[in-house]
Amino acid sequence: DAPTTRAVAKGGTGATAALRFTYLGTTARTDALSSGEVRSQVGLKLLAEDGCNLLYVMWRAGERGGVVVQTKRNRGKSTSFECGADGYRILTSPTPRPSAPLEAGPHELRARIDHGRLEVVADGALVWEGDVSAAIEGLRGPAGLRTDNARIEGTFSTD
């Protein structure tokens, strides 16, 4: 129920993660992101080297909602204090598939990188797939989860 949650799971390759959760809506108190935007979202972190270098798979609520894949790369920086909102880049799938905004209720979000190819499944539907090898080159770290202004209950798993 906190405005921001960040976590990583120690061990594993960091290339696979799943979150089964119930989205209970926006938190009572909301915080702006480093960019200044206020958004309710739940997501997975893959190859999370640190807070400045990783791949995100985020499921956003609201009218501009849906699943978004993005990298955050800031070479030489490792803490959010150092990089803030710098280094984000949205990745586009060569085969775009629509994904619905996150709404209240039970959900599952899964992501897997295999030989540089990312597949994202939301509530059983393939919503994003494509080659991310150039975007993740050199990243090494665990998988994790992230929430912003989203109340959830659920379970997280990784490889």
Predicted regions mapped to residue ranges:
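Ligand-recognition surfaces built from glycine- and aromatic
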Residues: A134-D159
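Secretory/extracellular carbohydrate-interaction modules
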Residues: A2-C83
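Short, aromatic/His-centered strand-loop micro-motif at the edge of beta-sheets
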Residues: G76-E108
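Hydrophobic residues positioned within well-ordered beta-strands of beta-sheet architectures
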Residues: A17-L19, V42, L109, A143, ...
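Residue-level detector of high-confidence beta-strand sites
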Residues: Y56-V57, E129-D131
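Short strand-turn-strand beta-turns centered on an Asx-Gly dipeptide
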Residues: V121-E129
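Short tryptophan-centered beta-strand motifs in secreted/extracellular beta-sheet-rich domains
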Residues: L19-F21, A104-A122
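A generic beta-sheet turn/junction motif
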Residues: D50, I113-H115, N149
